[in-house]
Structure formats: C-alpha cells, structure tokens
Regions:
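Bacterial N-terminal signal peptides that target proteins for export
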Residues: 2-11
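Hydrophobic core
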Residues: 12-16, 20
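Intrinsically disordered, low-complexity regions enriched in polar/acidic and amide residues
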Residues: 13, 30-31, 340
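Sec-dependent signal peptide cleavage junction
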Residues: 20-33
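N-terminal non-catalytic accessory region
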Residues: 31-196, 200-215
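Helical cap/lid subdomain of alpha/beta-hydrolase-fold lipid enzymes
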Residues: 156, 164-342
C-alpha cells in the first residue's frame, strides 16, 4: 500500500509540475494546473496493455490492483489509458496512438509500409479516446518504459509531420494522414516519461539468447491470439503484419499462414527500437518542442556491491528481475554493433 501511494504521488507530481511552475505564487490557489485543465493520456510499454484490452478490467496496467484512471479522474485529473501494440515499433505505436485519439483507421504511412513490408492501414477505432482533442483541448502525455519513446516520436511527428510520407502519398495518388502533415505541436501541453530507455538498453546486448527467446515466444503468442476468439482479451494489434483471421478463412488456414510469416525479420518492432544504436538514431530525428513541458523520471534498482564495488541488484528488487539485473550489471562491451562507444 505504501509503495502504491508513493508511486501515485510521484505520478501526480510529475504531471502537474510543469503547469504549476507557470503560475504566479499569488494565483496558485485560484488557477487550474495543466493537469486539471487538460486530459492526460497514459501510454504503456513493452508487452503492456490499455483500457481497450479486456484484460485491463481484471488487471489494469496503470494500478495493477485497481485502476488509476477513474481514481485520478475523480480527483479532477481527466485520465485515459491508451492501447498500442505491445510489440510494435515506436513509429507504428505513434500512428496507433494518433488514430486512437482521433477515432480513425491507423495509417502507418505509404513510405514506412513499403520500407518494412507490411500493410499501410491497421485497425479502425470507432470512436476517439475522448471528444474534442485540439489546440484548445490539449493533452498531457505520460509514457512508461517504451511508452516514453512512443510519445516522444508521436509528438515529433505531430509537430513536424513527415515530408517522406507526404511525398509517398502524393506519388501513390492517395490522401496523406493529417498526422503526417504536422503543425499540431500545440495540441500537447506536457510530456512525462517514467523509467523510459531513451538511449536504448544494454539488456538486449548482454542477454542475447534470453532476448531472442522472449522475442520468439511473444511473437508466437501474438500470432496465436491474433487469429483466435481471445484477440480482444489482449490485443497485439499486428493487423498490418497479417496477424488476424481473414474473412472466410478457417482457423487452420489462418494458423498455417501466420506461423509461416516472419515478424521479427521486418525490423519494425520493439526489439529493434530498444537497441542502443536504433534508439540513438531515433533520438537524432526527434526534436524538442519549445512550448511543451518535458519531464523524465528514471528508476534504479541496483546498488554498489560491498565486496567488489560494482553495481548489482538491490536487496528489495522483485525476485523475478534479479537475474536480469545481474546480467545487465555485468555487461562490459564498450562498443555497440554500429560502433557507438558506451
């Protein structure tokens, strides 16, 4: 209970901090903060889920034992839990977030779809996450873990658009998504990240076999759930890669098709974007928006060893993560595959 209260206090403090700094001291008690004036949209990380997934009603990602969204809304902070692809790349997730906020069909972009060999369009959201998103009704963005990379790229595209996607749509004779047209930086008030791997993670480098197993196992789960009646329970949202049951297709036909598809080879997924080299490439493309307030809260559950002085897992770390932290702390390769010096 104490940990839950501590986390909630931190979350509220981060979301509100930027807007509170804007208010004169004398007016602090009479004016609303940005978190009170504008809705806050929460974006989950790797293998996470949002309110659109049925599992959220049983085990909410934001809160786990109880849903933080209605609690925060009841306190005057309008809050929503977005659902984006648990294994999808930052680009694909950003496109899904835009479609979810606007109640439209996901458009991954003609150029992007052609480059990575998947369909241009994905799922259709029948209604927006909430009504009225605009420059007059901005949003506060909160991203946990890989959700941090997602919302940073989302804001960058929202603000600057994509000249490549505009050109590709024009060449194809199709309409470009408003998302890729840019000019909407003023639709976001603040951006907050929680334990986000902004520069990638060495875990993928030091635990290659474990990472490969996790990638293959989660991909197999995505394929099986994607064609089953349980898709809505936990939706991987990989329609662009064909992970769904087509009209008139039997379960066995769909199973044979998806099992022979290779999602990981497309390099358009979370496992690639979490590498240090790819994360740095994303960072090079992402610009800071001058009128948006940014906050980042890091986490560290390692401590210096009393015997060696080197970092090791903290005594109060969740047992499941102890071996992972141990391997990560032992990583010593000073150079990434693309030659970046750590």
């Amino acid at each position: 209970m104490k940990k839950s209260k501590k986390f909630l206090c931190l979350l509220l403090a981060l979301v509100m901090a930027g807007s509170l700094l804007l208010l004169p001291a004398a007016a602090a008690n009479t004016q609303q903060s940005g978190a009170e004036r504008y809705p806050t949209v929460y974006v989950h990380g790797l293998m996470g889920w949002g309110a659109r997934d049925q599992i959220y009603a049983v085990t909410p990602y934001w809160g786990l034992t109880s849903d933080l969204m209605p609690y925060l809304t009841g306190k005057g902070y309008e809050s929503y839990a977005a659902s984006v692809g648990p294994l999808s790349s930052a680009w694909d997730r950003a496109c899904e977030l835009y479609a979810q906020l606007t109640g439209t069909t996901v458009d991954y972009g003609a150029a992007h779809a052609a480059e990575y060999g998947h369909a241009r369009y994905g799922v259709t959201y029948d209604k927006p996450l909430f009504e009225g998103w605009s420059a007059d009704k901005k949003i506060n963005l909160v991203g946990h873990s890989f959700g941090g990379a997602t919302i940073r790229l989302f804001l960058d595209i929202l603000a600057d658009g994509s000249a490549e996607e505009q050109a590709a749509a024009k060449a194809a004779g199709t309409e470009v998504s408003p998302f890729f047209q840019g000019g909407k930086a003023d639709w976001v008030y603040s951006l907050t990240t929680l334990a986000a791997p902004h520069n990638g993670t060495t875990f993928l480098e030091c635990c290659g076999d474990m990472t490969q197993f996790a990638a293959e196992a989660s991909t197999a789960m995505a394929k099986l759930l994607g064609i089953s009646d349980f898709k809505g329970v936990y939706d991987f949202q990989l329609e662009q890669f064909g992970f769904y049951r087509k009209d008139g297709e039997t379960v066995l036909e769909a199973l044979d098709r998806v099992l022979h598809s290779d999602f990981l080879s497309h390099n358009d997924n979370v496992f690639r974007d979490l590498t240090i080299d790819r994360a740095l490439a994303l960072n090079d493309d992402i610009e800071i928006q001058p009128n948006v307030y940014y906050f980042s809260s890091a986490g560290d559950k390692t401590r210096p060893s009393a015997l060696t002085g080197k970092r090791t897992s903290a005594a109060d770390l969740t047992p499941l993560f102890v071996p992972l932290a141990h391997h990560t702390c032992r990583f010593s390769n000073p150079t990434t595959p693309d030659g970046f010096q750590l």
